[in-house]
Amino acid sequence: MARGFIDCHCHISASEFTTDTDDVLLRAKKAGVKALVAVTEGASEFEKVIQLSKTYPGFVFPCFGIHPLQGSGQDLHSVRVQDLDPFLYLFQTYKDDIVAIGEIGLDFTPWYSSITQERDEQMKVFIKQLEISKELDLPVNVHSRSSAKVTIATMKELGIRQALLHNFAGKPSVAMEGVQAGFCFSFPPAVSKNEQRAKLIRQIPLEHVCLETDSPALGLDKHVRNEPSNVTISCEYIAKVKGISSDVVMEVTTQNALRLFSKLKI
């Protein structure tokens, strides 16, 4: 197996990368990144992420998913069923191309989903996409802000076996429920400034940890665009917290990623 990193959760189809995708991916390769798992937040990105996977074959691996929050800026709102239903056919159309269903999940942050109706709608969209993942035999790439316990419980209820909980911020006891279910957890560079997250990372076995950047967001400086090349920062931080070498973290997390995303061929 080639030595190197896998960025298990990034948004390379985001508008922030439109003008210099080549340069961004070249920097990633120079940093030792061997593959990007490219998630989407909405159906408007589906065709773009497929095109990127064809432009950069064997490096950009596409996922389809509808995020629990839709829109942007002042228009950011909790997802609705109509954000998913008209695009369900695309999951079937591109089932051979996509390597996972994501980014999907729940976001119960009070200012985005303050009422039961919004949370119920999110749950419907989440469950529909979990069912798609089972039908297509694909792993899920999952968001769980302010909803860690219910997110893990829902996946367990539906019999999900292959899941990545990205930028996980739940309690260690909740994380261990995910570990027992066989799920993996990934952490972006921004967590290196968070002592609570260090406690969490210490408790999760390395065999259940993956690397991610969540780029263009969640870099060390929130005012600077994050990039896949910064997956090295996540690796070094996890190594420091666990008291092991960066090489061991790189090797084990890459093995974990290849096991989780079985369609990745690097």
From Swiss-Prot:
Coiled coil: none annotated. Its EC number is 3.1.21.-. InterPro entries: Metal_Hydrolase, TatD-like. GO terms for molecular function: metal ion binding; nuclease activity. Zn(2+) 2 binds at residues 103, 143, 166. Transmembrane segments: none annotated. The keyword Secreted does not apply. It is an enzyme of class 3 (hydrolase). Its main location: nucleus. GO terms for cellular component: nucleus. Binds 2 Zn(2+) per subunit. Exhibits AP endonuclease and 3'-exonuclease activities in the presence of Mg(2+) and Mn(2+). In contrast, in the presence of Ca(2+), shows AP endonuclease activity exclusively. Zn(2+) 1 binds at residues 9, 11, 103, 214. The 3'-exonuclease activity is sensitive to the metal ion present in the active site, whereas the AP endodeoxyribonuclease activity is observed in a variety of divalent metal cofactors. 3'-exoxonuclease activity is suppressed in the presence of Ca(2+), Zn(2+) and Ni(2+). It is found in: Nucleus. Belongs to the metallo-dependent hydrolases superfamily. TatD-type hydrolase family. Exhibits 3'-exonuclease activities and apurinic/apyrimidinic (AP) endonuclease (in vitro). Show preferential AP endonuclease activity on double-stranded DNA substrates and 3'- exonuclease activity on single-stranded DNA. PANTHER family: DEOXYRIBONUCLEASE TATDN3-RELATED (PTHR46317:SF3), HYDROLASE OF PHP SUPERFAMILY-RELATED PROTEIN (PTHR46317). This is Putative deoxyribonuclease tatdn3. It comes from Danio rerio (Zebrafish).
